[in-house]
Every structure is written in C-alpha cells, then in structure tokens.
Amino acid sequence: NGLCCSQYGFCGTTSAYCSRANGCQSNC
C-alpha cells in the first residue's frame, strides 16, 4: 500500500512517516 510506518505503529506517506531521521521503521 506504499505506507511507511513509524516506531510507534503509525503509518503514512509523508516525510513525517517515511524519513529515517523521524524514526521510520518499515517501507522507508
């Protein structure tokens, strides 16, 4: 589905979710 997910389990497609610097854990 193209979503990136953070270490807290929240997912989205913006840099807030997809940036490793912001804690992205999957589909980064």
From Swiss-Prot:
What GO biological process terms does the UniProt entry carry, in alphabetical order? defense response to fungus; killing of cells of another organism
Q: In which tissues is it expressed?
A: Seeds (at protein level).
Outline the protein's biotechnological or industrial applications.
Answer: Has potential use as a flocculating agent in water treatment processes.
Looking at the keywords, is Protein transport present? no
Keyword annotations for this protein? Antimicrobial, Chitin-binding, Disulfide bond, Fungicide
Pfam families the record matches: Chitin_bind_1 (PF00187)
Task: Point out the signal peptide segment.
Answer: none
Which Gene Ontology terms cover its molecular function? chitin binding
Domain Chitin-binding type-1, first and last residues per copy: 1-28
Q: Which cysteines are joined by disulfide bonds?
A: 4-18, 24-28
Keyword check for Lyase: no
- Write down the PROSITE patterns for this protein, in alphabetical order: CHIT_BIND_I_2
This molecule's function is given as: Chitin-binding protein which functions in defense against chitin-containing fungal pathogens.
What this protein is called in its record is Morintide mO6
This protein's species is Moringa oleifera
Q: What is the lineage of its organism?
A: Eukaryota, Viridiplantae, Streptophyta, Embryophyta, Tracheophyta
